[in-house]
Amino acid sequence: MRPSNRTPAQTRPITITRQFTAHAEGSVLVEFGETKVLCTASFTEGVPRFLKGQGQGWVTAEYGMLPRSTHSRMDREAARGKQSGRTQEIQRLIGRALRACVDMKALGENTIVIDCDVIQADGGTRTASITGACVALVDALNWARGKGIIKSNPLKFLIAAVSVGIYKGEAISDLEYIEDSAAETDMNVVMTETGKIIEIQGTAEGEPFSHEELLELLALAKNSIREIVDVQKAALN
């Protein structure tokens, strides 16, 4: 039995609130149960130096956790003077995932910067960030089209992400912190709306997992991501 009494395949309640802040071209508050992340998408004309003159755009991401997003306060990384390895890994994951769903040629020489700020953490912050950031990205692209900055829609498909794992010998979806911290296997999966894989991050935290368990976890993730994409589409409509 899971601590929340959810079934193994059941995700937490998921909500996506668009236009959550006033200034960003795209902004979303995404909630996976008690995990809450503010995702903003900022559209700027121009690209990094390494892309100048190539006629294509760029999408990148930054990620951070507010000091009291966790049970005890942690120092801001800006106060420490450097980002942790975890932060760098997560923001690279978010950026890679979002670049997979954008036609960079159609974006033109423009840049979208995604900022994911964790307001409250209860497991799955990186997967919630990707899910919310995708919706914020859609809004930023629609803003640019409305302004005539880009002509065609660069979005190739929606993407979403979920954590899956093996907890007390059972494959489960959308782990909250108490499950994540005690899981034998922890995996983050990013997929397209049609179920194609963009990225898999999987680690045997306690016990090695079998090929059959890997397939079970991926099937669990695919079904959960299908449900999460439905939430994205409902928010966008």
Curated annotation (Swiss-Prot):
It catalyses: tRNA(n+1) + phosphate = tRNA(n) + a ribonucleoside 5'-diphosphate. The keyword Nucleotidyltransferase applies. The keyword rRNA processing applies. Keywords: Nucleotidyltransferase, RNA-binding, rRNA processing, Transferase, tRNA processing, tRNA-binding. It is an enzyme of class 2 (transferase). Its EC number is 2.7.7.56. One of its GO terms (molecular function) is tRNA nucleotidyltransferase activity. GO terms for biological process: rRNA catabolic process; rRNA processing; tRNA processing. Gene3D superfamilies: GHMP Kinase, N-terminal domain. SUPFAM superfamilies: Ribonuclease PH domain 2-like, Ribosomal protein S5 domain 2-like. Phosphate binds at R86, G124, T125, R126. Phosphorolytic 3'-5' exoribonuclease that plays an important role in tRNA 3'-end maturation. Removes nucleotide residues following the 3'-CCA terminus of tRNAs; can also add nucleotides to the ends of RNA molecules by using nucleoside diphosphates as substrates, but this may not be physiologically important. Probably plays a role in initiation of 16S rRNA degradation (leading to ribosome degradation) during starvation. Homohexameric ring arranged as a trimer of dimers. Belongs to the RNase PH family. This is Ribonuclease PH. The gene is rph.
